[in-house]
């Protein structure tokens, strides 16, 4: 069964009303008693009742005017039966037991799910929650090894009420739960300037999405609304709101609870007393003086590709065919997370990612006049520090596993230390400033490249943890004649 659905079902089991929260969700053909005609009739009745104009919402987003979008909506709705309006949603009530424990075999987590009045402040809360810069909740939890990742989702919404789910990947739920409370208290002390800063970050996050993802956020997620208002009161209400806590822990399963078509090893969560000190929270923006650092005198060689009007974008990557493996690359990304998030607060953007089989760091620097020397220097110093490899998540598709291994298997030259650096956009002055920052890297920058060696040949067999098998054939085409010959063979 789908593990995220099992966990969501465990949370919904804590709702005593309406009864729909515990109704049948999944099952096998045997559970339907084999009566296919009755199933088809029930599905038809459901469709005729609910797939009608008065019970549906249509969301449109596009470059057209509101009038044009309205005409498109009217044209779509013309083919729908009007139907009956839905009855008012019954109030959501939680049951007697709201602290639950679910036995799991892997991926322990904490779900903290408060019932709150709908508010635009939820999107602002999400921006604070997803922040990874030094002083944030997630940076502190990772530093103490209390949690790995976080997500915020809606479990339910009606016209006035919302049921949120704050989901933390953690095997220490008591400590994380306590720090969430401390964090909500700290958020109540944020200033209007700080709240506006995070609101603007939420708008940047939204604008970076594709049009389809923007539409999804408007309909089901956390699209930015009005500027912050009453955020401290919202956080206080959130802290005091009725909520469900679910600790997903790797413990021996006890008796199972049948709910929503699942059989869940669900029990009461008996919290252990914890007295860990609160994390030291800090919120942004930083004072301008905190971004200034002494500029090195020496300069490293830097390839500059001018592009008039474009902001400076720095690309750093290991020499060709010398990229770290996936385990080391993932660990480097974890190491860089706080400083890349700090760069985002300063008006820039950074990403450590895999591109065509090689790990690379892309830094979009802020507008001219806003040079975060301290942040950039901290990022560059991180590149010289060793990292402990992380176990990469298993690839569920065999051919993707082979494709991911291909660049490393094709490499023939020995490992070469150093970094390749290039700057796209920006002015000559920007290039000079960045070249001086790059001199902080202890390894060679843009070292001479050895002559490329021919690609490996032959057949190589790789062990795949799954049960599938796959064959990948790679044929390098060094010139146009080879490509033409291959096309003739095809």
Residue ranges and their predicted role:
Residues 1-46, 137, 148-152, 178-224, ...:
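Acidic/histidine-enriched segments that form metal/cofactor-coordinating
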Residues 21, 52, 57-112, 260-287, ...:
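An aromatic/glycine/proline-enriched structural segment found at the starts
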Residues 32-33, 57-60, 126, 165-171, ...:
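Second-shell loop/turn segments in exported
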Residues 48-54, 156-162, 308-311, 352-358, ...:
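Short, flexible turn/loop "capping" segments at secondary-structure junctions
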Residues 66-71, 172-178, 254-258, 324-327, ...:
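Short, conserved charged micro-motifs
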Residues 118-129, 308-352, 377-379, 473, ...:
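Active/ligand-binding-proximal structured segments within catalytic/core domains
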Residues 130-170, 337-355, 472-477, 490:
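A structural supersecondary motif
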